[in-house]
Amino acid sequence: MAGRLPACVVDCGTGYTKLGYAGNTEPQFIMPSCIAIKESSKVGDQAQRRMMRGVDDLDFFIGDEAIDKPPYATKWPIRHGIVEDWDLMERFMEQIIFKYLRAEPEDHYFLLTEPPLNTPENREYTAEIMFESFNVPGLYIAVQAVLALAASWTSRQVGERTLTGTVIDSGDGVTHVIPVAEGYVIGSCIKHIPIAGRDITYFTQQLLREREVGIPPEQSLETAKAVKERFSYVCPDLVKEFNKYDTDGSKWIKQYTGINAITKKEFTIDVGYERFLGPEIFFHPEFANPDFTQPISEVVDEVIQNCPIDVRRPLYKNIVLSGGSTMFRDFGRRLQRDLKRTVDARLKMSEELSGGKLKPKPIDVQVITHHMQRYAVWFGGSMLASTPEFYQVCHTKKDYEEIGPSICRHNPVFGVMS
């Protein structure tokens, strides 16, 4: 272990990629997961792009640099957590390693993360890119949910370190509810919710557009995003909240000032109901999506009820939040309250149905919030990759050359974690 350079931890999400070195508490770089490529190479499919290899190949930008580059086409290689364009992903990784981390990939072990329900073929592609293109000495592909559970140990609410729990991972593009038992994901019970950070931004944008005319149209999305991040919170009761704003507006209504990108003049808007209506779509999805009407508390309940009966109580007791979209104030408290109501109603009903003969033991419902929530997956990865055992469970270059990319289909669960 001594004298070894720290491992690199890279967590690629739909909206943002978090990267840094193991042992740190937060990622060194957080950047949009996008890549800007030359217009000419945009035309046609991947096969055609391969034909045009050459100088054009080196002409691309990633992250924040890629966002406003007019002659270039901005592409997002990851959709709903899963990599869709491997060519672009390889180029993205190239800049991450050499330009941002400034690392020599031959000298560092790598920990990459994968979303739930990622296919074994995708793991093989990842292994090929890392071992063939970058020649890394070792690679471990960790499941995001397990890392989020490990990160939750920093919370005061956690008494014992356990790898059994329900992870609610809500990022920019997708929200997953993932039950984990003893470090293994119960794949058949995972549910995904088609509401995440981006949907809240769009919904806030819609609300602002109806009411505030002063926002320049081309900036309405970034204004909505800023309003969401700065002012939004989750309220315990919608009707009471509306009354609060109606009776004492000056106390609750906030002001947001932005600068018009074209005229460079300031514009000011009032932010009222949007503050609590944005995140409310987690609990009333029908506000924003007429096709999906199940509140997040019911989804979590359904996921746990689908799991084997002997792990249900521990799953209710350890509900862990992870990802930027769970950062709204009081999100955890509201979720815990709604879920507790659902669970208590079920227990009461079973007692009534038995004619009072059965007295079910109350179920402890606990939603864990902690200050590492936003980068929980990355932080969990950083914790694990700084343990000596990490180097024993990594797949090495030697294994890869002997057996091939299929070695990365399975990544062992750490014993050291719990």
From Swiss-Prot:
Single Gene Ontology MF annotation: actin binding
Predominant localisation class: cytoplasm
GO biological process: Arp2/3 complex-mediated actin nucleation; positive regulation of transcription by RNA polymerase II
A cellular component annotation (GO) from this entry: cell projection
Gene3D superfamilies: 3.30.420.40, Actin, Chain A, domain 2, Actin, Chain A, domain 4
CDD domains according to UniProt: ASKHA_NBD_Arp3-like
Localization in the cell: Cytoplasm, Cytoskeleton; Cell projection; Nucleus
Entries under SMART domains matching the protein: ACTIN
UniProt-listed Pfam families: Actin
Keywords associated with the record: Actin-binding, ATP-binding, Cell projection, Cytoplasm, Cytoskeleton, Nucleotide-binding, Nucleus
PROSITE patterns: ACTINS_ACT_LIKE
Assembly with partners or alone: Component of the Arp2/3 complex composed of actr2/arp2, actr3/arp3, arpc1b, arpc2, arpc3, arpc4 and arpc5.
PANTHER family associated with the record: ACTIN
Job description of the protein: ATP-binding component of the Arp2/3 complex, a multiprotein complex that mediates actin polymerization upon stimulation by nucleation-promoting factor (NPF). The Arp2/3 complex mediates the formation of branched actin networks in the cytoplasm, providing the force for cell motility. Seems to contact the pointed end of the daughter actin filament. In addition to its role in the cytoplasmic cytoskeleton, the Arp2/3 complex also promotes actin polymerization in the nucleus, thereby regulating gene transcription and repair of damaged DNA.
Family per record: Belongs to the actin family. ARP3 subfamily.
Protein name in the entry: Actin-related protein 3
Organism: Takifugu rubripes (Japanese pufferfish)
Gene name in the database record: actr3
